Amino acid sequence: MNIAKKLAALLLLTIALVVTSTSSAAGTKKSNGGPLRRAELKEAESRLSKMGYRTGRVDGVIDSATQQALVTFQKWEGRRLTGRITRAELEAIRSATPPRPKDAGYKHVEVDLDRQVLLLTDDDGEVTTILPVSTGSGKHYKEKSMSGLAYTPRGRFRIYGKLEGWRKSPLGLLYYPSYFSDGLAIHGNPSVPHAPRSHGCVRIPMSAAKEISERLPVGTIVLIYDAQSFVSAKEWVQ
């Protein structure tokens, strides 16, 4: 009888462990694989916004501004460009640190050609705004009476001229252009592909163009670089 009771107790314990394990696995699957709650979406927006990504309203509603901010985050972090906030993306956002510029200590703009991302800093060199860009495609073009290489120059520049609103150029329309080199500008454009597609200008989203223009007075330093071409401009501000 004692042996029978022990066997029965062991069987009941085994069943209880199996049920507990199954319930735990189901709960984990539900919490990890289910859709994000609005509070979690709002958390993702809030964290992105605090790091400098332009999310628009932080309200837990995934609109075009939120998607654009997420793509910019994914560009910077080297993640797959989906524009979707999944649970994996939320965890990546939670563990991310704010982007840091290559140069620090003074106000300037940096355009990272490899990431296709623009960083705008404050007077102390801390990043305040992060935007997606599309720069020169690197291909030869021929449009109307013009032809050339669609190239965004690397190096250090200064904003030397600005226009408000739209400006019609031989190669297209520029919205709130801030010129930095030989007619090339940082400007708004309705089309900002994930990859380099411009004739050489630095395209930014239309929604940010006016604000960015107002924050780039003539004389603002612009650093444009890829992995092999960074040049500091600290000596210009010493």
Task: Give short role names for the model-derived ranges.
Residues 22-28:
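Sec/Tat signal peptide C-region and signal peptidase I cleavage site
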Residues 31-41, 46-68, 72-92:
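Short acidic, glycine/serine/threonine-rich helix-capping segments at coil-helix boundaries
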Residues 29-30, 36-37, 81, 87-108, ...:
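Intrinsically disordered, low-complexity Ser/Thr-rich linker and spacer segments
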Residues 9-19:
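Bacterial N-terminal signal peptides
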Residues 27, 38, 102-104, 149-154, ...:
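Exported/periplasmic cell-wall-interacting domains
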Residues 46-54, 71-79, 94-98, 123-126, ...:
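Sec-exported extracytoplasmic/periplasmic mature domains
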Residues 1-11:
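Bacterial N-terminal signal peptides that target proteins for export
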Residues 94-139:
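A structural motif detector for short, solvent-exposed N-terminal "entry" segments of globular domains
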